[in-house]
C-alpha cells in the first residue's frame, strides 16, 4: 500500500492525496491477468450531483487522467501501456451498487484513535464490516473492519 501526497488538491476532489492498494502477484483472483491496482481519494458526494451526463463524464475523466498521470510519475516501472483496464467511480457509482452516496464508519480523531468501532447491530448474527465499521480507504479499510468483527466473534473463545 502507498499513499501519494501532492502539493495541490486533486481536481474535483477535497484531498491532495490518493491511496494505492496493489494486489499480491500470487493472488489468483485479483492477479490472474497481472496486478490489480486500486486507487482511491476523497470527493464530496454533492459535487457530482446536478451535472449533465456530459459534464459528469468530462469531470470524471479529467480527474481520472490527473490521478493516473500523478500515479505514473511516482512509479518508474509502470507505464501507461501497462494499464490494460481502467475505470473510475464517484459517489454516484457508489450509490448504484450499495444505495449510499457517502462512506460510512466512525472517523478517526485524536480522541478516538485507540478505540475500535463496534461491528454489532441490534440483530442477532448480523454484523457490520468494511467501511461501515472502519472509515478507511481501499482494502485496508475493509481488512480492518473484518479484523474488528473477527476479534468480536472470538472474544470469548
Regions found by a protein language model. Name each.
Residues 1-31:
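Mid-domain catalytic core of redox enzymes
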Residues 11-13, 55-92:
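Flavin-binding catalytic cores
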Residues 23-27, 42-46, 133-134:
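Short, glycine-/Ser/Thr-/acidic-enriched flexible segments
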Residues 27-34, 117-122:
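Short glycine/proline-enriched loop/turn "hinge" motifs that connect secondary-structure elements
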Residues 28-30, 48-49, 136-138, 152:
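Short helix/loop capping segments that flank catalytic or ligand/cofactor-binding pockets
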Residues 31-70:
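Conserved FAD/dinucleotide-binding core of flavoprotein oxidoreductases
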Residues 73-135:
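A glycine-rich dinucleotide-binding beta-alpha-beta segment and adjacent secondary-structure elements
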Residues 126, 131-154:
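A conserved FAD-binding loop/helix module that cradles the flavin
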Amino acid at each position: 500500500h502507498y499513499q501519494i501526497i501532492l502539493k495541490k488538491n486533486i481536481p474535483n476532489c477535497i484531498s491532495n492525496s490518493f491511496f494505492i492498494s496493489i494486489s499480491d502477484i500470487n493472488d489468483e483472483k485479483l492477479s490472474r491477468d497481472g496486478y490489480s491496482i486500486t486507487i482511491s481519494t476523497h470527493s464530496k458526494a454533492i459535487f457530482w450531483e446536478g451535472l449533465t451526463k456530459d459534464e459528469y463524464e468530462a469531470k470524471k475523466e479529467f480527474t481520472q487522467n490527473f490521478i493516473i498521470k500523478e500515479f505514473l510519475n511516482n512509479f518508474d516501472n509502470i507505464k501507461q501501456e501497462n494499464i490494460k483496464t481502467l475505470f473510475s467511480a464517484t459517489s454516484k457509482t457508489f450509490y448504484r451498487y450499495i444505495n449510499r452516496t457517502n462512506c460510512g464508519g466512525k472517523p478517526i480523531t485524536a480522541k478516538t484513535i485507540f478505540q475500535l468501532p463496534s461491528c454489532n447491530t441490534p440483530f442477532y448474527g448480523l454484523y457490520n464490516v468494511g467501511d461501515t465499521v472502519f472509515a478507511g480507504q481501499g482494502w485496508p479499510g475493509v481488512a480492518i473492519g473484518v479484523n474488528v468483527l473477527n476479534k468480536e466473534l472470538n472474544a470469548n473463545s
